[in-house]
């Protein structure tokens, strides 16, 4: 037996061992809490309960909010659940009394259901609950709540005063107590119970009259008082007590007794004495069929003498005559008593109170009065009290327990410490937000600058230069400028004489002399370059360098051609020049926007050692880079980075290789073909090696940034391959062929059945929606065909089903092809929310409340599973059968809307949350709204999506908000809406979630929305859905689209 008990305890069924000690609650108990409370019988569990109780006591004393009733309500509910056995440990009576005494002066709680619940709990502890309800009615507490009249009527019904109970119900209905439908329902149930009892009573009386049965002794009979005016315990008499006193208890007389007409009927009186019984009429002597059974044998036996002495006044029971008393005879001897003997002292026997505390008598003065009287006396005492306490008495005796001054000081210190830490965290969070805003602003400026530069580079025109001599490179005569930015290039010397000294060679020759001077580095002198350029060139045309000439950009192919035609001597001279490292310059300083210098010259492109000279590189140089494969990689990474909307800052790659005066180079140095020479100076090779290292590091950073993008196709594909094998699921199938062409009227094989495409419903960027029907059925089903071979929707559905278990019933199947996939859902006769917006004249207040309520519950489940949807738009939501079949009550109110597109969803359990929220489609729709910068979590994007959808349904336009200094509010006014208070609370709550958990926010909003679903609401809702179903049903939409030339819709 002991082993079985231990096994039950191990299995978590401790409550099975102590069912009889658990006090039942009308609203039931939480099973997990009950098992935990019963398992915490040890000292550790008891200590944990005491700590939680201490926390509630502290919260009551130091509560600074505007709803103190909430703390008491949570404290009492926690006590009920964690002390299932009741008793002195729970101290429920004192707890309820202190709560009522503390809140009795708050008139705002008089019609609060929580405050009325406290009074009802107090009524269960009172001697006369009816007096308490009369007192509540006189004070106006709970008179507008249905629960007040229901509980009051139940007390009268328990006392079988059905008339008064019915009067109480009628009074509540006349006052229209809320909720009125619940009160009326309880009244009807009460009337049915009374009617049933009346019919049963009539039937029992008829049965007793027709078939009188011998009464039986009742066991465990009730001793509860009955009656309306006088309370008297019922007297149940059975067996021989109901017969006439003259009859025998053993056998009945065979001969009936004659009834004398002039003889009075005597009634048995149990309170009459023995003398009065002799006056009763004696029965007529009749012959006995059998000897009677003696009634009192102990009185018929002759008692024997116990002693020869009888006390005076005693007489034998069988002799009514008086007997003379015999005087007592004293003994004729005297017992001997020793003189030295002492009387033995008896030790008093005292029972241990810990053992026999149940049977100990109650001490005088321990009798406690009625709780209602104590509450009333406390209220009168508070009204009459005029003393002023000079210490914090309210904090010492606020709760049930008592706090010392040291404990109060400690709690005050902890509270201040907590506030200081929260302020520090808030300050640090604000600083992070400001830094993030600055970074985003810098990114936007950089992107704008790059866009302008790309436009200028894309529109740049290139002209072919005429060559007079195939061995020479000439300068184009026509000026070419675009958007006010001068075009730059690397210039080759015009002289065919290999011994002619170019300006760049002059600079290089002067550099050894400059090393010995006091100057730290030499500066390029343009005038000197112009003087040297005036020397005549042999074998070529004279070039006037007094004035700088316009330049032209050579294409890569042209440069390669000219390099082949130039003589080897000229190439050798040119390869001795060290090309400028633009990558080293760009990555060697932080991102600072620099204005291009229009007075720059192409000669600076060859002066690599002149670090103080400003250089400006144009973006078109990427198009003529020496390494086309590296260029494609860089462009690909740039595209991925733009897709992720996240710019990587290369501040960690700061390399101090040049002088302090460093500016961004705009020269097209990559266009020069002479940098490919294999013979170069050692410094040139070292710089080239360092540039290659920097390019590799930058490429790795760009790749990591692309992988971190949650919407990157390659990243999603790698994630699906590493996490799970989709082919192992029965709902997933793979076809090793291209995706079939989806056209209206054609058949497509989906799983074991063939479907016929009826109509194209919606066309989006990367997927399309079709209405299809099985070949053997006319029921329309919606499928989603995507051009991406990544079944991300199916993955999200699997994760939701895995993490939510039975709380998620959305089923879908997927078929993957080589170049796409198709997902079809198990819903029939459904349409998107986009169709509903196109028929806004049928959208009523009830339909909007139903849709938003469904959306709140769905998104709450997504966030519990750590998944962000990111695209809560009309095109991604479908309306289920609850809309088209409003009288089908099998489907609940929270099954009307479902999500069918998870293209923008992010699984935060396996994906990093360090990304820009602007990648969500909801953020793209609300672009320009300042509230987006206030999102501290990806989950908040879904809250804004719900708010935008509600705004779209109510005002027919997207969300517009503003900051009033304290809260985010709508630009539109909700005062003209039906149930404007509900919508005002909804938008204020969902727009100002701040750092709170979105799961709790969504749960609270769903509960508040669900409170509107009463009988009247359902009546209006079903009427509106019936009208709407005729318009947006799939059959009606197919008919309308067949009449239109377009057919498919465009996304919202």
Curated annotation (Swiss-Prot):
Residue positions, PTM Phosphothreonine: 781, 998
Tissue specificity annotation: Highly expressed in thymus followed by spleen.
Main location: cytoplasm
Broad enzyme group: transferase
Keywords: Acetylation, Apoptosis, ATP-binding, Cell cycle, Cell division, Centromere, Chromosome, Cytoplasm, Kinase, Kinetochore, Mitosis, Nucleotide-binding, Nucleus, Phosphoprotein, Serine/threonine-protein kinase, Transferase, Tumor suppressor, Ubl conjugation
A GO biological-process term: metaphase/anaphase transition of mitotic cell cycle
Noted disease: Defects in Bub1b are involved in the development of lung and intestinal adenocarcinomas after exposure to a carcinogen.
Role: Essential component of the mitotic checkpoint. Required for normal mitosis progression and tumor suppression. The mitotic checkpoint delays anaphase until all chromosomes are properly attached to the mitotic spindle. One of its checkpoint functions is to inhibit the activity of the anaphase-promoting complex/cyclosome (APC/C) by blocking the binding of CDC20 to APC/C, independently of its kinase activity. The other is to monitor kinetochore activities that depend on the kinetochore motor CENPE. Required for kinetochore localization of CENPE.
Protein name, as recorded: Mitotic checkpoint serine/threonine-protein kinase BUB1 beta
Source organism: Mus musculus
Gene: Bub1b
